[in-house]
Amino acid sequence: MGKGKKLLITGGRGMVGRNLIACAARSGWEIIAPTSVDLDLRNAEAVEQYIRRQLPDVVVHAAGVVGGIHANIADPIHFLADNAAMALNVVMSSFRSEVVTLINLSSSCMYPACIEGPLKECDILRGPFEVTNEGYALAKTVGLKICEYIDKLPNFNYKTLIACNLYGVGDNFDPRRSHLLPAIIEKIHKASQCGSESVSIWGDGTARREFMFAYDFAKIIIKALEVPELIPSSMNVGVGKDLSVLEYYSLVARVIGWSGEFVYDLNRPVGMRSKLMDITHLTALGWVPERSLEGGIRSTYQYYITGNEVYE
């Protein structure tokens, strides 16, 4: 489907957006990826005019205000208001312009905190959100539901891909906004460089997380664009297994070559104990990630120390 078709990607400067642009370019898509300077997605009128002018064949909504536990706790207002506004503006403007295929990207953070995993798509809204990212989760749920309603209409394919935690080339290592794996890379690299013998872990290290390499996720998005009618309205995208936070710290330490000890900060929030997702729908399509966790971490660390953006 890609060759000669016009693909609008929001959030093209983010990690997922960068990986998606690289992947889509190799598949022959004509890519439009406005920056936040070019187009403020929170401005409904501006988004409406932009989409009417560009008339994309398909849209991937990858933009969002994102961050780890600290950022979500510190600024729930913007995590809710900005993410909800962007989703509604992009989805509704696309719908009114009769864009028939849209992929909305969401996150496992939207799942209820009380559900025992693996988390299934039908578990959404079956309980309260995790309090540490409630604003973000609520905004993502709004985006999912509006796409779900449109997807029920004839001739429209508005799908939501619910990603597990992502990492990779183009990641954000700023400790104020980074997610778990880039934060670990930043902390252990600095400990290695300054000769520190210990690194602090939030919590006791037993919370579990599932991570996918961002370029693998980008390839799945492209596959979904090619056959949107084959996927359900919402679909989990993950690797089907998780590790403890301590195991991620240990793996990053091995990749970097640091051999210090870990100290547990039990006064820090840790979020949900586990967010492993059920990927039955994904595997039924034969779509599986290709990059090993250690290989992905090595590629991400090379990007961190060199700044070279090699997407593959």
Curated annotation (Swiss-Prot):
Its EC number is 1.1.1.271. NADP(+) binds at residues 11-17, 140, 179. It comes from the Bacteria. The active site is at residue 136. Substrate binds at residues 187, 202, 209. InterPro entries: Epimerase_deHydtase, GDP_fucose/colitose_synth, NAD(P)-bd_dom_sf. One of its GO terms (molecular function) is isomerase activity. It is an enzyme of class 1 (oxidoreductase). Induction: By flavanone naringenin. Keywords: Isomerase, Multifunctional enzyme, NADP, Nodulation, Oxidoreductase. One of its GO terms (biological process) is 'de novo' GDP-L-fucose biosynthetic process. Pathway: Nucleotide-sugar biosynthesis; GDP-L-fucose biosynthesis via de novo pathway; GDP-L-fucose from GDP-alpha-D-mannose: step 2/2. The record marks 107, 109 as: Important for catalytic activity. It catalyses: GDP-beta-L-fucose + NADP(+) = GDP-4-dehydro-alpha-D-rhamnose + NADPH + H(+). Catalyzes the two-step NADP-dependent conversion of GDP-4-dehydro-6-deoxy-D-mannose to GDP-fucose, involving an epimerase and a reductase reaction. Belongs to the NAD(P)-dependent epimerase/dehydratase family. Fucose synthase subfamily. This is GDP-L-fucose synthase. It comes from Azorhizobium caulinodans (strain ATCC 43989 / DSM 5975 / JCM 20966 / LMG 6465 / NBRC 14845 / NCIMB 13405 / ORS 571).
